[in-house]
């Protein structure tokens, strides 16, 4: 690669910037002060142009994109014509209620500790849930396996086995391997 060729591709300081790029730079320049804008290199300006384009594309597609940091806290309108500073809902952020331990107890069922099963009694203890929707009713009738137990019986490997052993298949026909000698050994 020739070193002179790389310098020929770079724009010089006084070079004319194409109109399309200049328009994109003008869109971005309003987010910065004149001093900041003059200190920036062309490559930094291009990065900001692409950041704004990606943000606009994501929001047009309906995704919730994070507003780039350079676009925040400036008195400008966004690409859809909405004025950020005059938005009445701007400062009203929705506060989500925090989950406390008491609320979590109300949502998740209380699981009773398992007692050792007596020899004569085959039925299992079933955890009960307390809360407004269950009012102490049993979740599953005794003697019937729960859904998770059914799933484990059908698909899951047994304890003590390796996780991949249930994936191995048995060969239907016995394979006999023969020892193949090297041609170099036959020459002796």
Swiss-Prot record:
Compositionally skewed regions (Basic and acidic residues) per UniProt: 115-127
Family annotation (PROSITE patterns): KRAB_RELATED
Protein's GO biological process: regulation of DNA-templated transcription
Gene Ontology, cellular component aspect: nucleus
Region Disordered, residue ranges: 113-162
Keywords assigned by UniProt, alphabetized: Phosphoprotein, Transcription, Transcription regulation
InterPro entries: aKRAB, KRAB, KRAB_dom_sf, SSXRD_motif
Superkingdom: Eukaryota
Modified residues (Phosphoserine): 123
Short name of any one Pfam family annotated for the protein: SSXRD
Database matches in PANTHER family: PROTEIN SSX3 (PTHR14112:SF19), SYNOVIAL SARCOMA, X MEMBER (PTHR14112)
Function: Could act as a modulator of transcription.
Sequence similarity: Belongs to the SSX family.
Subunit record text: Interacts with SSX2IP.
Protein's UniProt name: Protein SSX3
UniProt gene name: SSX3
């Amino acid at each position: 690669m020739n070193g002179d060729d790389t310098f020929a591709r770079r724009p010089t300081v006084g070079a004319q910037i194409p109109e399309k790029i200049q328009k994109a730079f003008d869109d971005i320049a309003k987010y910065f002060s004149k001093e900041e804008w003059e200190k920036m290199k062309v490559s930094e300006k291009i990065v900001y142009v692409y950041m704004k384009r990606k943000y606009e594309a994501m929001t047009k597609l309906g995704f919730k994109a994070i507003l780039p940091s350079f676009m925040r806290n400036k008195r400008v309108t966004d690409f859809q014509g909405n004025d950020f500073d005059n938005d009445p809902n701007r400062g009203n952020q929705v506060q989500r209620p925090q989950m406390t331990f008491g609320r979590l107890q109300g949502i998740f069922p209380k699981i009773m500790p398992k007692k050792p099963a007596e020899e004569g009694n085959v039925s299992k203890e079933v955890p009960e849930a307390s809360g407004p929707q269950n009012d102490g009713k049993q979740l599953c009738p005794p003697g019937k396996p729960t859904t998770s137990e059914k799933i484990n019986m059908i698909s899951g490997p047994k304890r003590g086995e390796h996780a991949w052993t249930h994936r191995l298949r048995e060969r239907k026909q016995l394979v006999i391997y023969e020892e193949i000698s090297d041609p170099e050994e036959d020459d002796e």
